[in-house]
């Protein structure tokens, strides 16, 4: 299942200066997905879902949270379209939008986002609806990258063995 090699990711740099003014470092933009998606509203899906995920997991900076309080409230209630927050923010993500932990996640996961998005919603990933049920499917993938793979649960055999041993001791 080959993915387009045309997709490129903006690297995250520290803020730089131009003529003495600080420039915000762009992390990703809707333009990164526009060619593959074919339409602006569809190109917003991967990063819109990603930004909603970051909001749900408190990976956004205090400044971002303060500036987008109204849209974040709708995200927490899962109201409206998932990409509304991303659209309201100008369809561009900046390094300053994230907490330090958020930036670590962004640096580690954003290069993988397109592949996970395409694999989760194949064959026509950009034809999905902008809704919370689709968001949840991708969020289930993203959480593994944020928290790591789930650890295997302790087998009930170990617990059962402990119970049998204790019951046997009581009968003696």
Residue map of PLM features:
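N-terminal low-complexity, intrinsically disordered segments
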Residues: 2-14, 18-80
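Compositionally biased, intrinsically disordered low-complexity regions
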Residues: 5, 14-20, 99, 112, ...
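Polar/charged low-complexity regulatory segments
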Residues: 28-30, 35-37, 54, 134-150
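Intrinsically disordered or highly flexible coil/loop and linker segments, enriched in small
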Residues: 59-63, 95, 99, 152
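Amphipathic protein-protein interaction modules
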Residues: 76-146
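Glycine-rich, aromatic-bearing surface loops/beta-hairpins
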Residues: 155-172
């Amino acid at each position: 299942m080959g993915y387009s090699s045309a997709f490129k990711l903006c690297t995250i740099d520290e803020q730089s200066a131009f003529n003495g003014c600080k420039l915000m470092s762009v992390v990703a933009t809707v333009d990164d997905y526009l060619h593959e998606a074919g339409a602006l509203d569809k190109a917003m899906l991967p990063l819109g879902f990603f930004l909603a995920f970051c909001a749900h997991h408190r990976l956004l900076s205090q400044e971002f949270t303060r500036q987008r309080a109204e849209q974040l409230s709708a995200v927490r209630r899962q109201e409206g379209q998932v990409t509304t927050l991303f659209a309201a923010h100008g369809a561009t993500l900046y390094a300053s939008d994230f907490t330090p932990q958020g930036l670590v996640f962004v640096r580690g996961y954003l290069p993988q986002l397109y592949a996970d998005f395409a694999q989760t919603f194949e064959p026509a990933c950009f034809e999905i609806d902008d809704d919370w049920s689709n968001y949840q499917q991708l969020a289930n993938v993203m959480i593994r990258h944020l928290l790591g793979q789930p650890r295997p649960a302790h087998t009930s055999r170990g617990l059962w063995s402990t119970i049998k041993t204790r019951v046997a001791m009581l009968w003696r």
